């Protein structure tokens, strides 16, 4: 028993290449040997190979078996050797698989996908809700979460966790930030507002300099807590700044004056409601905002803004610029028709 245990330990310590080479050699040579020992029973190489494979991987079918003493002795060797070879291979594959799962859970595996969204930071409810809403959207397929936690705080097939400091280029490389669609920076939890915004600013400037290094513009959205810190972020070239605490204050104040308005806002922001806010590009046949407004309205949607300019409703005859980013309110089916260039029947 001790002999077989030591033999198994030695085989397990073999390099993968050595083990594969040894296994292939065993399966190649064994049929030749059994053919030499019992040429009548194993008249072809294929019959010998079939017997070796069945003997080492199953209990045997009994269609081919050695009948002479030398054949039986060799058969015994094949059984034990095959048992250790197959057992070692299975053990090594299992070990690699368990190691892969552990590395993925601990955020030590690099992400090599493209067109993903990167979320930096973690807080239980806020970011969980954000991820839920993003994954409910058809345009979001994969999310990479960067945080300094011992293991992934969320288990989902579309979420890849990276453990590391977001202010280090190595971490951004591992998350493949250069080929992401956008980076979302959440304010750190449990930190006073003046320090939290400082950390967010440091991350934002790191992403900006990283983008210059890889020669790509990285679309960045940052959550900040204090309005008087807005000016500090101008130099960081953050594409969108969200005042999280103030947004809630505005919503509550508006709801108290215009009762029921909060439900309207929440429905437009949630991916679970029927009508949502979408972004579309300008069509060639749309010259003025009125052209776009009328066609979009006829299809059952509503044009509300170009970028952050909501005054276009009062300027219907203004020519739409080529770089227009038109925001509409529509259900999913209507949005698909508009974005795919659906033509209205006259």
Task: Please provide the spans of the model-predicted regions.
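Cytosolic regulatory regions of ion transport systems
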Residues: 1-23, 36, 65-66, 70, ...
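Hydrophobic alpha-helical transmembrane segments of multi-pass integral membrane proteins
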Residues: 24-29
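Pore domain of cation channels
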Residues: 30-33, 41-106
């Amino acid at each position: 028993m001790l002999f077989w245990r030591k033999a198994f330990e030695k085989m397990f310590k073999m390099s993968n290449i050595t083990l594969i080479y040894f296994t292939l050699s065993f399966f190649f040579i064994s049929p030749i040997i059994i053919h030499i020992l019992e040429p009548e029973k194993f008249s072809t190489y294929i019959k010998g190979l079939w017997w070796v494979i069945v003997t080492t991987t199953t209990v045997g079918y009994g269609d081919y078996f050695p009948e002479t003493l030398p054949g039986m002795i060799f058969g015994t060797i094949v059984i034990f050797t095959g048992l250790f070879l197959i057992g070692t291979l299975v053990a090594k594959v299992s070990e690699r698989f368990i190691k892969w799962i552990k590395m993925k859970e601990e955020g030590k595996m690099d992400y090599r996908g493209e067109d993903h969204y990167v979320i930096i930071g973690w807080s239980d409810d806020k970011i969980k809700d954000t991820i839920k809403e993003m994954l409910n959207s058809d345009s979001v397929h994969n999310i990479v979460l960067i945080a300094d936690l011992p293991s992934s705080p969320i288990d989902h097939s579309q979420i890849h966790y990276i453990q590391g400091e977001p202010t280090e280029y190595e971490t951004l490389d591992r998350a493949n930030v250069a080929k992401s669609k956008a980076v979302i920076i959440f304010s750190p939890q449990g930190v006073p507002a003046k320090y939290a915004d400082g950390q967010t600013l440091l991350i934002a400037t790191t992403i900006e300099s990283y983008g210059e290094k890889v020669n790509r513009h990285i679309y960045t959205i940052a959550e900040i807590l204090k309005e008087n810190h807005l000016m500090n972020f101008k130099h960081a070239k953050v594409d969108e700044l969200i005042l999280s605490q103030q947004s809630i204050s505005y919503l509550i104040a508006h709801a108290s004056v215009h009762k029921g308005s909060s439900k309207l806002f929440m429905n437009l922001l949630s991916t679970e409601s029927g009508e949502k806010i979408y972004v579309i590009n300008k069509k060639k046949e749309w010259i003025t905002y009125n052209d776009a407004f009328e066609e979009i309205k006829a299809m059952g949607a509503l044009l509300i803004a170009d970028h952050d300019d909501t005054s276009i409703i009062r300027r219907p005859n203004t020519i739409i610029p080529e770089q227009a980013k038109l925001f509409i309110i529509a259900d999913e089916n209507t949005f698909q028709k508009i974005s795919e260039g659906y033509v209205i029947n006259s």
